[in-house]
Amino acid sequence: MLKDITLGQFFPGNTIVHRLDPRTKLMAVILYIVALFNAKSPLTYALVAAVLAVCIVASRVPMKSLTRGLKPVYVIVAFTAVMNIFFTGGTAVGEGWLLGHITYEGLTAAIYMVLRIVMLSMGTFLLTYTTSPIALTDGLENLLGPLKKLHLPVHELAMMMSIALRFIPTLIEETDKIMSAQKARGADFESGNLIQKAKAMLPILVPLFVSAFRRADELATAMECRCYHGGEGRTKLHVLKYESRDYIALALGAAVLALILTLRKFVS
C-alpha cells in the first residue's frame, strides 16, 4: 500500500504540459476543480473526463503510475459509494430488505461521486507529476504575492508546502525500509484484524519519527550553509514568464468551465 502512494513524485519530461508555466498549471487545476464540482450530468462529466484524458496523453505520464496512485483512495471511494447508495432517498430499485434501501437516485449520486473523487485525484496527481517542487514553490509564491501586502509570509508558506510534497515519497520509502527490516526480524504486519494491524504498526513510528527529524535537521543545516534566510531580498535564477502556450491553455480552461456552467443550466 505504501508503494502505491505517489503524491509528490515528479516525472521529468519535455512535453507541452511540462513546459507550461507552473502558475498556469496551478490556475488550470483550480479551473478543473471548479468545473468538476459543477458537473451534474453525464454530458458534463464526459467533457471533464475528455479534458483530463487529453492532458494525460499530452503529458506522457505513465497511466500505470496514475492508477497506482489511486489505490490508497479506494477506501474513500468505496465508503462514499456505500453511503450514497443506501442513504439517499428516492425511488427504490426493487423490493426486500436490500433492494428496498437502494434507490435510483442513490446509485446515480454514487456514480457521480466516485467519478468526481477519481478524476479529482488524477488531476492533482498530474500537477505534481509534471511540475518540479521548486517550480511549484515559485508558481505558488508568485500567485500568492498580493497577500504580502497583508504581511503574510507567502514565501515561507510556499516553501513549507513544497518541502512537504518533496518529502512524502522520501518518508514513504523510509517507512518501507523500516517495515522490511522489522519483517526480517519476525514482525507480522499482515495478519489479524484492523486493530491488531494498527498495533503492529506502532513499533514503526519511533524510528520513523527519528528518521524524519534527522532529515529535517540535515535539510535545515544545508539551507543555512547556502545562506538561506527566507524570501526577503532573495532573487531567482529562472524568472517566471508567461508565453503564448500559457495564455492558450488558460483560455481553453476558462472556455471549458464556461461550457460546463452553461450545460449545467440547460442540461439536467
Give the predicted meaning of each segment.
Residues 63, 79-84, 99-102, 227, ...:
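A general structural signal for short secondary-structure boundary/capping elements
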Residues 70-187, 194:
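Juxtamembrane/interface alpha-helical elements of multi-pass membrane proteins
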Residues 14, 37, 61-65, 97, ...:
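Membrane-helix interfacial "entry" motifs
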Residues 41, 45, 60-64, 88-96, ...:
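Transmembrane helix-loop junctions in multipass membrane proteins, especially transporters and channels
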Residues 25, 64-74, 249:
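Alpha-helical transmembrane segments and their helix-start/interface "positive-inside/aromatic belt" motifs
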Residues 1-44, 48-53, 57-59, 142-152, ...:
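Transmembrane alpha-helix interface motif
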Residues 55-59, 64, 72-76, 80:
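Extended cationic-aromatic binding surfaces that line active-site or macromolecule-binding grooves
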